[in-house]
A protein has these predicted regions:
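Short beta-strand segments enriched in small/hydrophobic residues
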Residues: 31-43
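N-terminal segment of the mature soluble domain
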Residues: 44-122, 189
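Bacterial N-terminal signal peptides
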Residues: 3-12
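C-terminal/domain-edge helix-coil "capping" segments
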Residues: 16-33, 110-115, 134-219
């Protein structure tokens, strides 16, 4: 089946997919900053493939020249496991962030200090019922959002919504589709989290004493 999505957008075989990208107009101040990779629990029916999927995303993030040092899943959990109070705070922070979109500042400041990362990068994958104009009764929303820990500001986000076809709900197709769409979100993030040429041109017009060069920040 061919479905045309009106916002975002793509003409694709299968379910209807829309991608939205938003972020701050100037991303240069956030280039090459240390990042803590935050993840949620496995969505329904993806428990078996979720650890591998998270691992693949983490590897891709560590390859991005625009990101600084990435504190990954295992390293993060080692720090949290050694500090039960911090782990409880992390769970509260993550729950608030995923349910409301709000970065709770007091908890974020503690996590920023312990994880030594001024930026948080959250992979959020939600499965929920779809009731209007859907090929089936299931839709996914996948977000990869970069947040400044201290301010709680959203720096950059890629959001993909996919309404599943009935034939995409078999176990094999389900797992394969989850990996494919998550990779798509990461690809969109990598292609969008950049500094446009005109921003570099503006930077090069500054006095040499305050100018930032690409080579100085590793991109």
């Amino acid at each position: 089946m061919i479905v045309v999505c009106i916002s975002g957008l793509m003409l694709l075989l299968g379910g209807c997919k829309t991608i939205d990208v938003k972020g701050k107009p100037d991303l240069l101040p956030y280039m090459q900053k240390p990042v803590a990779f935050l993840t949620i629990k496995s969505p329904d029916n993806l428990q078996k493939v979720w650890p591998e999927l998270i691992g693949q995303v983490e590897l891709r993030l560590k390859e991005m020249s625009t990101l600084g040092r990435v504190t990954g899943f295992k390293e993060r959990n080692l720090k949290l496991d050694s500090n039960p109070k911090l782990r409880s705070g992390f769970r509260t922070y993550l729950s608030t962030l995923t349910l409301t979109g709000i970065s709770e500042k007091n908890l974020a400041w503690k996590l920023e200090e312990e994880l030594n990362s001024p930026l948080f990068l959250l992979l959020d994958f939600v499965s929920f019922p779809c009731t209007k104009e859907c090929p089936s009764n299931v839709q996914w929303v996948i977000r990869l959002k970069l947040i400044e820990a201290h301010s709680g500001d959203l720096i950059f986000q890629v959001r993909l919504q996919h309404k599943l076809d009935e034939n995409e709900k078999t176990a094999e197709a389900y797992n394969e589709l989850a990996a494919k769409l998550t990779t798509k979100v990461v690809d969109e993030f990598a292609s969008g989290f950049i500094v446009p040429w005109h921003r570099w041109r503006f930077e090069h017009l500054k006095p040499e004493s305050v100018r930032k060069l690409r080579s100085e920040i590793g991109i």
